[in-house]
């Protein structure tokens, strides 16, 4: 086990349970993990303010990290590992390094740098910086590493008779995502397909902010959206009963979303707006349809043809264990 006996101080925001998946995966290969939320709280107000202007909570964030530093002061770590680093300041990273000089500091960005105003402030303080976004890696000299799927997705069965939905979308509402998904849904319904869409906002502050900025969303009733994340159990059930998954990435983002990699893991077909997916080794036009963001079109042939298996060595290279081995090499 490549992390046998290694001590890791791990920071990640609560994000649909992925922080637990990563912690459990590290422990499964021998690591001893101390986990802390990267944000000082997870209520909608704190999440919303951090996204809009984290400096408004600087005192609160500093107090939170002071407490963590005191709690971990007497411990020795091999690694201090951050996911994204949305709320922590450069000053607090420096202080962690001061008290844990023996540790390797690693950060992984699973969002575009353009979507995280705090990201570039932190880069100089980490020994290794990874990103899922190829363009960010080329521009800033970061290590490129796509996201991962967990065993939960790899273990989803596929039985034709149990497929209920031809198209499934579950995701956060941003940019033009709602409008695009609905345009794709309309086409599939016209072809006789059954669709399920589920749109999420992390907080009502972000919902009202986006509603002010987006004239299209102002026409959509508030009850259309969800303000609590879908449980992982329900999401896995929906994947098991779906033929095609929809992905609409943020316009400022070139990296493949978690949804893309999970769809690979679940062996489902994918419709995406991210044309960069054609550069990845698992791309197969029989399984993955890239649509124009301005004029999405779904051929009936793609809807009806079966999924084609990905070569085993390529498929397994996107597992969470392989992702960890790339980070902690």
Task: Give the role of each language-model region.
Residues 93-100, 185:
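Surface-exposed amphipathic alpha-helices with a cationic face
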